[in-house]
Design a protein with these regions (language model features):
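Short loop/turn segments at secondary-structure transitions that flank enzyme active sites
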Residues: 114-116, 152, 162, 235, ...
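Generic short beta-strand segments
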Residues: 111-116, 208-211, 230-234
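Intrinsically disordered, low-complexity coil segments
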Residues: 118-139, 192-197, 233-240
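Preferential activation on post-signal-peptide N-terminal prodomains/segments
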Residues: 1-136, 262-266
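C-terminal soluble interaction/assembly domains
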Residues: 220-223, 232-267
């Protein structure tokens, strides 16, 4: 069981400007990126053949240990590693043209976990049938992003929404054929409540994971095992589907994502 806390975004950053920290001739700016962000921002594939050596004096395993020591110090419990990569320092000039790229350090992303399994970080702010609502809501994600180089941690950002209490309990879930039988009933009913513009929806991904649900009392929540049926136009960005339905893995009922998000966001 989880109780809502006062969500506060926190950060640990270098006081020194990155260009002063890592100066380079002909460069005006420098920005550190994870591999995914580097590819997204530059439109360039990262080193696929691992021919570029990471200049960090720590191995990736040593760096991860230091990242997890930091998480322990800030009281981050029940988290799991979601992603890790080399750290790319992209140097640009005054015209925003790339001057150079150095690979030095690592980027780690952790998220809330249940029994050491990361919970879903899938967002519904691009889901077509939920964009018609009057107010903007989305499911908050407890994410911890840490970057480090040979000098240690240089940047960290995180936000806590929930405080865990008690022990997790086992849940009996439906077999997948049983779930599909229930889904044939519950998904059409869901789309009557939140209609979409399509005559038919072809989901292209199905995932068994944990998802946040509302508890019995105000401010009380729990992570349940669920099946997420989703359709994603951009398969390189699966956390932002265009259609998405969350089914309770125990009984096949649809979890109202918007209702849960509103309750988490309530003062």
């Amino acid at each position: 069981m989880y109780y809502k806390t006062d969500s506060v975004y926190r950060s640990f950053n270098m006081r020194e400007d990155f260009m002063m920290y890592r100066p380079k001739e002909k460069a005006t700016y420098v920005t550190p990126y994870s591999k995914a962000d580097y590819e997204r921002e530059t439109g360039t594939e990262a080193d696929q053949e691992n021919t570029v050596q990471n200049a960090c004096s720590y191995s990736k395993e040593e760096a991860q240990m230091k990242a997890e020591e930091f998480l322990s110090k800030i009281g981050a419990k029940d988290v799991a590693l979601q992603d890790s990569s080399d750290l790319y320092w992209v140097y640009t000039d005054a015209k925003n043209s790339v001057v150079a790229t150095d690979v030095d350090g690592y980027s780690f992303t952790y998220v809330r976990a249940v029994d050491k399994q990361p919970v879903s970080t899938m967002a519904f702010n691009r889901v077509e049938n939920l964009q018609k609502q009057v107010e903007y809501y989305d499911m908050p994600v407890e994410r911890y992003e840490i970057t480090m180089d040979s000098n240690g941690i240089i940047n960290a950002n995180w936000c806590d929404y929930l405080e865990a209490t008690g022990e997790s309990t086992k849940t009996e879930i439906l077999s997948f054929p049983e779930l599909l039988e229930k889904a044939n009933e519950t998904i059409p009913e869901y789309y009557k409540t939140y209609p979409c513009k399509y005559n038919a929806i072809n989901f292209n991904d199905v995932t068994l994971t944990y998802y946040l649900t509302a508890g019995a009392a105000d401010g009380q929540f729990e992570y349940k095992p669920v099946w997420i049926f989703s359709s994603c136009d951009d398969k390189s960005d699966p956390d932002y589907p265009s259609e998405m339905v969350v089914l309770d893995a125990a009984d096949g009922s649809v979890i109202d994502m918007l209702d849960v998000a509103m309750k988490v966001s309530a003062d």
